[in-house]
C-alpha cells in the first residue's frame, strides 16, 4: 500500500471514529478519494506532499472530460479539500493545494415559457365558484406582474393600489418594488375582493385558502397545475413558469433588458440575461429591421 492509500485510510478512520459519519457518507468519501489516488499514481506521485494546485486543476479537467457533471465534480473537489485540510491539521501538508480550485457552475435549466396563445387559454377559465375567481385573479397577477411565488402569497390587501393599477411587493433581500399589474389583473382582483368575505377571515392576506387562511405556496402550485390540465395545456403549469413567461413576452415585445430587470427585481442584469431568452427568429427580425448592415442595398 502506497503512502497515498495509507493517508486516505487514516482519514477515513478519522471520519468514522471521531466524526461518526454514516457508512453511506464514508463510502462516498472513499469513492471520491480513490479517484484522486488513481490520478496521482498515474502522474507518478508517491506522497501527497508532491501534490500542487496544478495537479488538482488537471484532475478536475480530467474528471470533466470523462463525463463527470458539474455538481458531481463540485462534490469531488469538496471531499478533496476536506481531506487536504485534515492533512494540514496533521502537519502532513503546509497548505491545501485544492483550496483555490472550484468546479464550473452547473448549467441552469430554465423552464419553457408558455406561449401567448396557451397563456390566453389558461387564463380563460370557467368561473363557477369563488375559488375559481380567486385562482383567475392569482393567475392574472402572477402573469401580469411577473411575481415570484413568495411575493404572490405574501401580498396583503394594503399592498394594492387598484386606482393606479399597481402593487407593492417585498422581494429578495427585503427589497420593495412597485409594479404595474395591468387592467385585467385589477378587474379580477376587484371581482375576488367582492367574494373574499365569504371565507370569513380577519387575515390581511389578499389571497385566502378555503379555510380563510393565507394561501400557501404549495396550494398555489397545486391549483395552477390543475388548471393547466383542465385547460388542455401540454406542459406542466407552475408559478415559476408564469414568471418566466412574463419576462420572455415582455422582452420580446420591448427589447428593454434593463426595464425587465427592474420589473423582475433582479439585482444583477446577468440574471435577467440568463433568465429570459429571446428566440432566434425574434432576434433576427429585430436585427433585420434595425441594423444598418442588415438592410438591403438600393
Curated annotation (Swiss-Prot):
The keyword Amino-acid biosynthesis does not apply. Residues 2-88 form the Core-binding (CB) domain. One of its GO terms (biological process) is DNA transposition. FtsK may regulate the catalytic switch between XerC and XerD in the heterotetrameric complex during the two steps of the recombination process. GO terms for molecular function: DNA binding; tyrosine-based site-specific recombinase activity. Keywords: Cell cycle, Cell division, Chromosome partition, Cytoplasm, DNA integration, DNA recombination, DNA-binding. It is found in: Cytoplasm. GO terms for cellular component: cytoplasm. The active site is at 148, 172, 240, 243, 266, 275 (o-(3'-phospho-dna)-tyrosine intermediate). CDD domains: INT_XerDC_C. Coiled coil: none annotated. Residues 109-288 form the Tyr recombinase domain. Site-specific tyrosine recombinase, which acts by catalyzing the cutting and rejoining of the recombining DNA molecules. Binds cooperatively to specific DNA consensus sequences that are separated from XerD binding sites by a short central region, forming the heterotetrameric XerC-XerD complex that recombines DNA substrates. The complex is essential to convert dimers of the bacterial chromosome into monomers to permit their segregation at cell division. It also contributes to the segregational stability of plasmids. In the complex XerC specifically exchanges the top DNA strands. PANTHER family: PHAGE INTEGRASE-RELATED, TYROSINE RECOMBINASE XERC. Forms a cyclic heterotetrameric complex composed of two molecules of XerC and two molecules of XerD, in which XerC interacts with XerD via its C-terminal region, XerD interacts with XerC via its C-terminal region and so on. Belongs to the 'phage' integrase family. XerC subfamily. This is Tyrosine recombinase XerC. It comes from Escherichia coli O1:K1 / APEC.
Amino acid at each position: 500500500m502506497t503512502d497515498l492509500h495509507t493517508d486516505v485510510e487514516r482519514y477515513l478512520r478519522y471520519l468514522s471514529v471521531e466524526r461518526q459519519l454514516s457508512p453511506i457518507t464514508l463510502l462516498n468519501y472513499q469513492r471520491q478519494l480513490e479517484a484522486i489516488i488513481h490520478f496521482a499514481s498515474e502522474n507518478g506521485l508517491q506522497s501527497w506532499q508532491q501534490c500542487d494546485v496544478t495537479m488538482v486543476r488537471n484532475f478536475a479537467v480530467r474528471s470533466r472530460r470523462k463525463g463527470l457533471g458539474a455538481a458531481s465534480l463540485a462534490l469531488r473537489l469538496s471531499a478533496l479539500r476536506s481531506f487536504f485540510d485534515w492533512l494540514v491539521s496533521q502537519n502532513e501538508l503546509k497548505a491545501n493545494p485544492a483550496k483555490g480550485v472550484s468546479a464550473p457552475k452547473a448549467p441552469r435549466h430554465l423552464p419553457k415559457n408558455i406561449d401567448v396563445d396557451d397563456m390566453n387559454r389558461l387564463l380563460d377559465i370557467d368561473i363557477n365558484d369563488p375559488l375559481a375567481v380567486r385562482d383567475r385573479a392569482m393567475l392574472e397577477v402572477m402573469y401580469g406582474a411577473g411575481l415570484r411565488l413568495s411575493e404572490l402569497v405574501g401580498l396583503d390587501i394594503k399592498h394594492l393600489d387598484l386606482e393606479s393599477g399597481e402593487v407593492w411587493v417585498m422581494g429578495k433581500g427585503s427589497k420593495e418594488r412597485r409594479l404595474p399589474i395591468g387592467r385585467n389583473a385589477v378587474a379580477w382582483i376587484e371581482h375576488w375582493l367582492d367574494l373574499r368575505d365569504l371565507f370569513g377571515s380577519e387575515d390581511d392576506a389578499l389571497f385566502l385558502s378555503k379555510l380563510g387562511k393565507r394561501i400557501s405556496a404549495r396550494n398555489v402550485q397545486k391549483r395552477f397545475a390543475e388548471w393547466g390540465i383542465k385547460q388542455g395545456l401540454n406542459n406542466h403549469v407552475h408559478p415559476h413558469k408564469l414568471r418566466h413567461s412574463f419576462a420572455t413576452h415582455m422582452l420580446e415585445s420591448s427589447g428593454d433588458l434593463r426595464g425587465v430587470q427592474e420589473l423582475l427585481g433582479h439585482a444583477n442584469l446577468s440574471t435577467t440575461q440568463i433568465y429570459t431568452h429571446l428566440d432566434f427568429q425574434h432576434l433576427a427580425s429585430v436585427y433585420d429591421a434595425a441594423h444598418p448592415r442588415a438592410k438591403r442595398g438600393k
